Every structure is written in structure tokens, then in C-alpha cells.
From Swiss-Prot:
InterPro entries: Ta0600-like_sf, UPF0147. Pfam families: UPF0147. Belongs to the UPF0147 family. This is UPF0147 protein Saci_0891.
């Protein structure tokens, strides 16, 4: 059971980091919208933690290629993706 709690802790930490991006007004609106979508996917309790993480990673990797993204936001997204890649069922 500890793996499940560990996965949930990682997901909660990722949501917190994404929430900072959503609240940062220097980040373009489309990137904040993608971060909001990733948060929504991470909080969907009907799916397993690994599926939720994979869905969020897909959204974040797609948006991380945006040339309008500030560098500090890109690094934060890469950190979130790295954390979510460790979530396993």
C-alpha cells in the first residue's frame, strides 16, 4: 500500500507545482490552460495513478514545445514531467 500513497504524494506535489504555473500571470493563457487540463487529469480518481500521470505527461510534453513559453515555466514543466514519470501502478 505504501506505493499507492507514494504515487498519490507525487501527484499532489505535481498538482501544487502546476497550480503555481496556472496562477502566474506572466505565463501565456494557452499554457495556463494546458496546466489546468493536466491538473484536471491528475485529480480524476476514476483512473489509476499511472494512467492519470501518463495523461498529464502527454498534455505537458505537447505544450512544452511552445516557443512563447517563458524559460522558468518550461523548466517547471520539465520538473513536473520528471516527477510524474516515476509514478507506477
Amino acid at each position: 500500500m505504501s506505493a499507492l500513497y507514494d504515487n498519490e504524494a507525487k501527484i499532489r506535489q505535481a498538482v501544487g507545482m502546476l497550480q503555481k504555473i496556472v496562477n502566474d500571470t506572466s505565463v501565456p493563457r494557452n499554457i495556463r490552460r494546458a496546466a489546468t487540463d493536466a491538473i484536471r487529469n491528475l485529480q480524476d480518481q476514476t483512473l489509476s495513478p499511472a494512467v492519470r500521470a501518463a495523461n498529464a505527461i502527454g498534455i505537458l510534453e505537447e505544450i512544452s514545445q511552445d516557443p512563447n513559453m517563458p524559460m522558468h515555466t518550461r523548466i517547471a514543466i520539465w520538473n513536473v514531467v520528471s516527477m510524474l514519470e516515476t509514478v507506477k501502478d
